Amino acid sequence: MHSFASLLRYGLAAGATLASASPIEARDSCTFTTAAAAKAGKAKCSTITLDSIKVPAGTTLDLTGLTSGTKVIFEGTTTFDYEDWAGPLISMSGKDITVTGASGHLINCDGSRWWDGKGTSGKKKPKFFYAHGLDSSSITGLNIKNTPLMAFSVESDDITLTDITINNADGDSLGGHNTDAFDVGNSVGVNIIKPWVHNQDDCLAINSGENIWFTGGTCIGGHGLSIGSVGDRSNNVVKNVTIEHSTVSNSENAVRIKTISGATGSVSEITYSNIVMSGISDYGVVIQQDYEDGKPTGKPTNGVTITDVKLESVTGTVDSKATDIYLLCGSGSCSDWTWDDVKVTGGKKSSACKNLPSVASC
């Protein structure tokens, strides 16, 4: 397996003003103060500054189809009026796009207006940010507060997200649920570097994709660093994933791989390295092949293979009522695993593990 880290190394309408000293610069640099102006004028700008935009209810801040090479800067406080709808609040696509946050900026979703403790099962709530078709691009230094539901939906090739802060801490007491930070699918080449997340669902969830690198993460609350659920999608392959140098605290799980019962697919070339956990309420390490309708059944199947899984220096503590390690594999579907310095303590030992490779233990 190749380390992905090593691969990485080798306006125009009302509400818009144009900053310039010449006609050419006037077309190139745009500042927008409304979502409508940004949508109308985006194609004519090589640099877009979004200054304290208040996005109308039920409206997406639409930055899809950006001209190649466009730079996007969030400035001031971006807010969103309330409506029960599926979103997204922001959508962006294009090639070679650079997205940054200006000093002191904030993207405040004010998610408590939607939170009801039910997540996707309650009233309609908008997802935050679609990075779909945002290829060969980067998102750096965004400060995000209180997303109504999932934060980033990533379906892009060769995209890097660095120094992203997602602070949904208020959701712990106000009913935040299904507030995943980074959901990755149908992507080749995703780098997530030094994120800081406090949420109420997965810090990272990879449903499909290849060449994915997550490093330097701080994950508080939520459900940990997850692969899956894999299966029953148009793409059921997860390959060459490195998740490293990250902490998971006060979460349900720390390290998790889950696959759908009766489905087919593959999870391969997976590395969890230098993961430190604390305050885990359910499972320190959990790999299971029995999910159906979003819940475990206790009956694993072997249609989705889990191979070449490496856990190294995965350490820490779980709560006394939690389970240190739980491994539930189908017959012959978990193989070629490597475990080194996996030390999870503080909880119960599982007697229900099944079909685990000889190098692993519960």
UniProtKB/Swiss-Prot annotation:
SMART domains xref list: PbH1
Active site location: 201, 223
Thermal profile of function: Optimum temperature is 40 degrees Celsius.
Record propeptide residues: 21-27
A GO-annotated cellular component: extracellular region
Induction field: Expression depends of ambient pH (higher at high pHs and lower at low pHs), probably under the regulation of the pacC transcription factor.
Known EC number: 3.2.1.15
Function: Involved in maceration and soft-rotting of plant tissue. Hydrolyzes the 1,4-alpha glycosidic bonds of de-esterified pectate in the smooth region of the plant cell wall.
Record protein name field: Endopolygalacturonase II
Protein's organism: Aspergillus awamori
